[in-house]
């Protein structure tokens, strides 16, 4: 009987140890599932941040230095069809929008230097190639446009001494310079020899080199830029990832009246700090824009199954309001609503930037000319589609119109009849339609797999843990009942049988059972 008790006790002890172990493992699985539900995406975010840092030799660095995309530039030129009538009769200028003239573009960063302080310095190199197969016309198409060098010079002379204006008129008469020129589209963009610039080149001392030898709206952009850009790599924190730190060794501009407006702390438009929300305000800096361009959330988008946020400038970005007074250092009158004066960045040429077709601008600007259709937000709005977790631009359209603010100068006979007007020259859009498949695959892997993995791990581990807990508790309870039953049975078996007294005869003697 004692052997059976020992065997039962041993069996019960082994049974209990096994299920207590199962219970411990089940609790661990449940806690792991809860941990995954709470911290898995944060850990993935930390890993992604680590991989995004621009380190030489990494995939991110290679794609940043040599982007695997082929951006494009589409140019639309406003051809003036009634230049003589406009000058002689005061007619409204009639414009014919030609284009698009399409150029494919190759981007890369060259002369990259690691400053060992969480920043890189580099030069942009851009190569443009005309694409006749995508264009509506050839880049040698002739167009009539305002003579920008001449009209810039006359507008700047408005407040000069009268004899200087008369002398300028004589020089222009000798050189046969007229307010409108006929050039090819390629010359307008990439440069042509201008008589005024040629004269200035001959007059100006050699030690005072002119900013450019030819005139072109994109002059000097086809090739390696001389500008040195310093950008944060993310090594010291992702809050400034992809943000410009210095431009030509300067941390801010010198043109505007406040530090906020002189700031250049923005992205170049290709990468942004990760973990973007709908409440984030992005900022893009471009030298030709001469300021930071703020971008705010517009709507959610989906590109090849990848979710993103579309950001666009606020409607009052070029408004004549209190917030933008810092961009008007000379004081009122400032640029009209919808225009931004970049003359301080363009050697005092009266260049005004706007969105195409004067989108978000004063309607009177478009009404001053004929031939420009009403603006369409879908065609003329600037936007960038960003993958919010990684801060990578997936699609973009930088749409800008270049205008010339002409001032009437009656003392210069060539432009005496040229009224005060904001004359549109051309507009262009630059950007990418979508990323290559290898980049999109990486984005899907980084953004779509982790949430699925988190749910699978958290729900799966938690469910398995809960089931094992229920099973272990059930078995332990049953084991406890079984042990109680065995103890009870053992107690009953060990109890001695009741004794019986021997039979006696009538005289009191015990009866012998034997015969």
List each model region and its residues.
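Extracellular or lumenal secretory-pathway regions
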Residues: 2-307, 315-510
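Internal glycine-rich, Lys/Arg-flanked active-site/core loops of soluble domains
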Residues: 311
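Intrinsically disordered, low-complexity C-terminal regions of metazoan proteins
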Residues: 514-515
């Amino acid at each position: 009987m004692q052997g059976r008790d020992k065997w039962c006790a041993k069996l019960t002890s082994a049974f209990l140890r096994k299920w207590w172990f199962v219970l411990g493992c089940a609790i661990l699985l449940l806690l792991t599932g809860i941990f995954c539900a709470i911290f898995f995406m944060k850990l993935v975010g930390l890993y992604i941040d680590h991989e995004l840092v621009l380190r030489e030799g990494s995939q991110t660095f290679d794609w940043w230095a040599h982007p695997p995309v082929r951006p494009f530039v589409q140019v639309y030129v406003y051809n003036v069809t009634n230049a003589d009538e406009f000058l002689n009769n005061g007619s409204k200028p009639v414009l014919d929008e030609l284009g698009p003239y399409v150029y494919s573009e190759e981007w890369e960063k060259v002369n990259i230097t690691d400053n060992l302080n969480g920043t890189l310095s580099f030069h942009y190199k851009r190569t443009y190639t005309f694409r006749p197969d995508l264009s509506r016309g050839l880049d040698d198409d002739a167009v009539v446009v305002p003579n920008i060098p001449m009209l810039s010079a006359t507008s700047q002379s408005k407040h000069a001494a009268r004899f200087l204006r008369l002398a300028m008129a004589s020089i222009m008469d000798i050189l046969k310079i007229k307010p409108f020129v006929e050039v090819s589209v390629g010359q307008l963009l990439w440069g042509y020899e201008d008589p005024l610039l040629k004269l200035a080149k001959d007059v100006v001392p050699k030690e005072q080199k002119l900013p450019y030898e030819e005139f072109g709206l994109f002059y000097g952009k086809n090739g390696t830029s001389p500008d040195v850009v310093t950008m944060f790599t993310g090594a010291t924190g992702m809050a400034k990832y992809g943000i410009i730190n210095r431009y030509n060794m300067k941390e801010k501009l010198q043109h505007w009246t406040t530090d906020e407006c002189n700031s250049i702390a923005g992205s170049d438009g290709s990468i942004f700090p990760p973990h973007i929300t709908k409440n984030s305000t992005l900022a893009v800096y471009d030298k030709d824009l001469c300021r930071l361009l703020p971008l705010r959330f517009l709507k959610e988008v989906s590109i090849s199954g990848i979710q993103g946020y579309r950001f666009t400038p606020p409607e009052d970005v070029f408004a004549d309001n209190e917030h933008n007074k810092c961009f008007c250092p000379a004081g009122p009158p400032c640029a009209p609503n919808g225009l931004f004066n970049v003359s301080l960045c363009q050697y005092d040429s009266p260049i005004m930037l706007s969105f195409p077709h004067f989108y978000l601008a004063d309607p009177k600007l478009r009404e001053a000319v004929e031939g420009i259709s009403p603006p369409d937000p879908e065609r003329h709005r600037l936007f960038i589609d960003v993958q919010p977790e990684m801060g990578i631009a997936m699609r973009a359209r930088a749409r800008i119109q270049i205008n010339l603010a002409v001032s009437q100068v009656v003392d210069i006979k060539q432009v005496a009849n040229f009224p005060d007007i904001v004359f549109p020259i051309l507009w262009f859009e630059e950007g990418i339609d979508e990323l290559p498949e290898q980049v999109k695959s990486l984005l899907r892997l980084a953004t779509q797999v982790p949430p699925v993995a988190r749910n699978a791990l958290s729900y799966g581990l938690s469910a398995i843990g809960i089931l094992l807990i229920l099973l272990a508790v059930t078995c332990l309870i049953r084991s406890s009942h079984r042990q109680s039953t065995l103890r009870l049975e053992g107690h009953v078996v060990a109890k001695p049988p009741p004794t019986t007294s021997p039979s006696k005869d009538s005289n009191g003697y015990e009866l012998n059972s034997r015969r």
